[in-house]
Regions:
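Short, charged helix-capping/linker segments at alpha-helix termini
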Residues: 1-3, 16-25, 35-54, 171, ...
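C-terminal edge and immediately downstream basic/flexible tail or linker adjoining helix-turn-helix-like DNA-binding
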Residues: 2-4, 96-100, 107, 112-113, ...
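Sigma70-family region 2
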Residues: 16-17, 43-44, 56-71, 90-91
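Amphipathic, Lys/Arg- and hydrophobic-enriched alpha-helical face
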Residues: 27-45, 62, 139, 188-191
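DNA-recognition helix of helix-turn-helix
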Residues: 85, 89, 138, 146, ...
């Protein structure tokens, strides 16, 4: 098995044997990507940081059940997604507790998350801030499964095949979710894309 095991899976197998240093390496590598995914699913940066800790606690506790047949990052983001869904369900049962976190406080969703978003010059800072706000709003209005699929797609570690495993749906369904999410965002963000519409709106 050894030569076919990816480096992250090899680290996790060491964790399975009680190697704390290997666990620390995985946390160091994946902590920020996990926080980013959770923050954009829940739209709450502070809660994302707390929930990310729970993700890695779960990883450590589940080490005995880990098998190197699946890509480590797929397994990791599946845990993160499940905890996010649990939190979303909790919020739906206790909506009053979630009012303060309904507006994202994360420090800006980078415009590079979407290839078509226009790049602004330094003099356009105010407009760029408005763009980030519009992107956040458009993301928040996507159905949960589309938003999750799209955000997972933006993580370099996850392919369509990986995402389909995380979401528990077919490859074609995954591609459809991501396609519909992108189409919805393009439609809502048309004034801010590289079509010249932004400038037209400012005239």
């Amino acid at each position: 098995m050894g030569t076919n095991v990816e480096p992250d899976a090899a680290l996790m197998l060491r964790v399975k044997r009680g190697d704390v240093r290997a666990f620390e390496e995985l946390v160091e590598k994946y902590k920020q990507p996990v926080i980013n995914v959770i923050a954009r699913i829940l739209r709450d940066q502070t809660e994302a940081e707390d929930l990310a800790q729970n993700v890695f606690v779960q990883v450590f506790k589940s080490a005995d059940r880990y098998k190197a047949t699946a890509k480590f990052s797929t397994w990791l983001f599946t845990i993160a997604r499940n905890l996010c869904l649990n939190e979303i369900r909790r919020r739906s049962r206790h909506p009053a507790e979630s009012l303060d976190s309904s507006q994202s406080d994360q420090e800006g969703l980078p415009a590079r998350q979407f290839e078509d978003v226009k790049t602004f010059s330094p003099s356009d800072n105010a407009l760029h801030g408005e763009l980030e706000e519009k992107v956040q709003l458009a993301l928040s209005e996507l159905p949960e499964n589309q938003r999750t699929a799209l955000l997972l797609c933006r993580q370099d570690e996850l392919s369509y095949e990986d995402i389909s495993e995380v979401l528990g749906c077919s490859l074609s369904a995954t591609k459809s979710l991501i396609h519909r999410a992108r189409e919805t965002l393009r439609d809502k963000l048309k004034p801010y894309l590289r079509t010249g519409a932004w400038k037209n709106n400012q005239d």
